[in-house]
């Protein structure tokens, strides 16, 4: 049985207002998708393709207008009480906006431990040990736990944001453009750390991005969204080639995953840039 099953899901939003005619905007239509435990898939598409809306449906933040999202065989929209609490512990979302995920008046350590206070029975000592271990796992130091969000760089804050998502040992983590504001080297470092976690613990990942190079670096399978529909799905291989025009456009715009050396005017290699 798949860990996550999206069955013929559609979603729409109200449009219009006081001075405009009301109507509906269909943002997702006929989405079918499965994810297995320990798998990493990429949701690839340009802005407005429906990626972030699908992420919200996967985590039960919104109920689909049509179809069903099931996690471990249970309809996500029907979970209540202890079942809902268990689901919140099992599935985590990381947004692009790291500053918005933290209370500016609370320390980084306090924020990372927040899911542990609400979703687990850990005592204070265990929470502190888990927080420090997560910081180290994400390439941060123990002293960062005492700092306020505004005292960290953007890259450090996003790593702390991911550490917070991993705190309660979820089975699934959805990264919604979570690496978009980071430089390429830091993106790769974080993905290497998450890949090690995936292999070690069997955590599944959904990487939502418009950057094909990151999807190719991290994911086992790629799903291409366009106009609210899945238009192509392929395993990630070194010779990945899309048939759909949107996929080919994204492929043409791809940046190299690693910095490339270029020849100097004298034909000698120069340092990577």
Swiss-Prot record:
Top-level taxon of the source organism: Bacteria
GO molecular function, one term: nickel cation binding
Binding site for ATP: 45-52
Keywords of the record: ATP-binding, Cell inner membrane, Cell membrane, Ion transport, Membrane, Nickel, Nickel transport, Nucleotide-binding, Translocase, Transport
SUPFAM superfamilies (UniProt xref): P-loop containing nucleoside triphosphate hydrolases
Limits of the ABC transporter domain: 13-252
Species whose genome carries this gene: Pseudomonas putida (strain ATCC 47054 / DSM 6125 / CFBP 8728 / NCIMB 11950 / KT2440)
Catalytic activity, reaction form: Ni(2+)(out) + ATP + H2O = Ni(2+)(in) + ADP + phosphate + H(+)
Name of the gene this protein is made from: nikE
Subunit structure: The complex is composed of two ATP-binding proteins (NikD and NikE), two transmembrane proteins (NikB and NikC) and a solute-binding protein (NikA).
GO cellular component, one term: plasma membrane
EC number: 7.2.2.11
Full protein name: Nickel import ATP-binding protein NikE
């Amino acid at each position: 049985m798949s860990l996550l099953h999206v069955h013929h899901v559609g979603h729409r939003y109200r449009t219009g207002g006081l001075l405009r005619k009301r109507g509906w905007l269909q943002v997702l239509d006929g989405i079918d998708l499965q994810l297995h435990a320990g798998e990493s898939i990429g949701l690839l598409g340009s802005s407005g393709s429906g990626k972030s809306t699908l992420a919200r449906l996967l985590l039960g933040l919104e109920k689909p207008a049509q179809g069903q999202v099931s996690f471990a065989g249970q309809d996500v929209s029907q979970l209540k009480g202890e079942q809902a609490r268990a689901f919140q512990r099992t599935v985590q979302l990381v947004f692009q906006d790291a500053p918005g995920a933290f209370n500016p008046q609370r320390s980084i350590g306090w924020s990372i431990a927040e899911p542990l206070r609400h979703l687990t029975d850990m005592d204070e000592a265990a929470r502190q040990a888990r927080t420090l271990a997560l910081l180290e796992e994400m390439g941060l130091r123990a002293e960062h736990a005492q700092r306020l969000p505004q005292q960290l760089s953007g890259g450090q804050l996003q790593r702390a944001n991911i550490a917070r998502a991993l705190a309660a040992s979820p089975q699934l983590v959805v990264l919604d453009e979570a690496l978009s504001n980071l430089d390429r080297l830091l993106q790769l470092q974080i993905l290497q750390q998450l890949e090690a976690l995936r292999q070690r613990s069997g955590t599944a990942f959904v990487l939502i991005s418009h950057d094909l190079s990151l999807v190719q670096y991290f994911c086992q399978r790629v799903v291409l969204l366009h106009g609210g529909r899945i238009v192509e799905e392929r395993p990630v291989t070194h010779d990945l080639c899309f048939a759909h025009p949107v996929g080919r456009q994204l492929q043409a715009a791809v940046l190299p995953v690693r910095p490339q050396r270029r020849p100097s005017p004298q034909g000698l290699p120069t340092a990577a840039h």
